[in-house]
């Protein structure tokens, strides 16, 4: 469980530890909720003179929410209801709480524990994988997390001079450059695993990039560089290290659709299938959690009730591209409903 949770009789207090936790807060919070958090607010005197910005603990009645994924911030806008006595005139004023990694938020109502744990289990895989895809011309490095696969570095080969003496196809100085960057990125991102991907003819030319405490898996792909990153995802190597981004399930959905088996539900059929307990696995694009939050809450509730497996698929992933073509939501069924 990535969130630190303290439960009281009529409140739940949560500390955000990863960006994924902000998705969870976005789904939990509703307009009308009273929330408390530390924030910064400008202090003014009775005659309007400014005394600067001060850190203060405020209770804010939620009006609306705005999620900024690139910044890793959830902005909660609302009306100040509870504030320290020295902050004169704050009551009834608008204020925005910016909740990010490390922030603690107290929500003044009880929250269904099963619903909360389902969200955490679904959205908050803490696994991070560094993928290093090597070709003769360049190396592409990507970070794979629960939110998808992001390209974080490209290293060009500035030493291409034909085949190296001794039979090597890759210049050692190029490999040294790659190793240096990978070690630096490992220090920054602290991945759980490292995947080195390249063509079979190059694999013997690439020595192990040893990073203390990080297991390394070497895989052969048809092409290195950026294409190799996507091939690693498509071929299920991320699943093998525990990071499931939904490709296998989406691929099976496409196969069942092509067969006309009747074991796939799309659109409004999904709600009918959920109400009948017919859904085995449901895949949803992550962007729907933000764009259609209320609908997402209903779907998650139904998955919990019927014990359907829920998989959130990153929009920019290979599986996400396929799922986009199906409307962003699809379900594999336990049995036909028509």
UniProtKB/Swiss-Prot annotation:
| BP GO annotations | nonfunctional rRNA decay; nuclear-transcribed mRNA catabolic process, no-go decay; nuclear-transcribed mRNA catabolic process, non-stop decay; ribosome disassembly; RNA surveillance
Q: What Enzyme Commission number does this protein have?
A: 3.1.-.-
Its assembly, as annotated, is:
Monomer.
Can you name the source organism? Caldivirga maquilingensis (strain ATCC 700844 / DSM 13496 / JCM 10307 / IC-167)
- Cell compartments where the protein resides: Cytoplasm
The protein in question is named: Protein pelota homolog
Out of the domains of life, which is the source?
Answer: Archaea
SUPFAM superfamilies found in the cross-reference section: Dom34/Pelota N-terminal domain-like, L30e-like
| Cofactor(s) required, per the database record | a divalent metal cation
């Amino acid at each position: 469980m990535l969130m630190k949770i303290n439960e009281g009789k009529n409140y739940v207090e949560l500390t955000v530890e990863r960006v994924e936790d902000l998705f969870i807060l976005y789904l939990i919070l509703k307009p009308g909720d009273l929330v408390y958090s530390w924030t910064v607010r400008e202090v003014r005197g009775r005659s309007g003179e400014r005394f600067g910005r001060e850190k203060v603990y405020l209770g804010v009645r939620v009006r609306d929410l705005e999620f900024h994924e690139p910044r890793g911030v959830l902005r909660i806008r609302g009306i100040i209801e509870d504030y320290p006595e020295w902050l004169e005139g704050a009551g009834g004023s608008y204020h925005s709480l910016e909740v990010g990694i490390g922030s603690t938020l107290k929500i003044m109502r009880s929250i269904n524990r099963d619903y909360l744990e389902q969200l955490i289990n679904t959205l908050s895989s803490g696994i991070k994988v560094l993928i290093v895809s090597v070709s003769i011309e360049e190396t592409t490095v990507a970070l794979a997390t629960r939110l998808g696969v992001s390209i974080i570095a490209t290293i060009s080969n500035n030493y291409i001079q034909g085949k190296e003496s001794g039979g090597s196809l890759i210049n050692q100085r190029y490999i040294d450059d790659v190793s240096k960057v990978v070690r630096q990125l490992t220090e920054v991102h602290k991945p759980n695993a490292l995947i080195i991907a390249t063509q079979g003819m190059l694999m013997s030319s690439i020595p192990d990039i040893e990073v203390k405490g990080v297991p390394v898996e070497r895989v052969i792909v048809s092409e290195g560089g950026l294409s190799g990153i996507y091939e690693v995802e498509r071929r299920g190597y991320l699943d093998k290290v525990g990071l499931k981004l939904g490709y296998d399930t989406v691929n099976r959905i496409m196969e069942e659709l092509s067969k006309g088996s009747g074991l796939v539900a799309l659109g409004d059929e999904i709600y009918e299938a959920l109400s009948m307990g017919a859904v085995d696995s449901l895949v949803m694009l992550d962007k729907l959690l933000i764009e259609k939050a209320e609908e997402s809450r209903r779907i998650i509730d139904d998955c919990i009730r019927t014990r359907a497996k829920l998989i959130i698929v990153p929009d920019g992933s290979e599986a996400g591209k396929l799922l986009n073509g199906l409307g962003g939501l699809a379900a594999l069924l336990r049995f036909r409903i028509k």
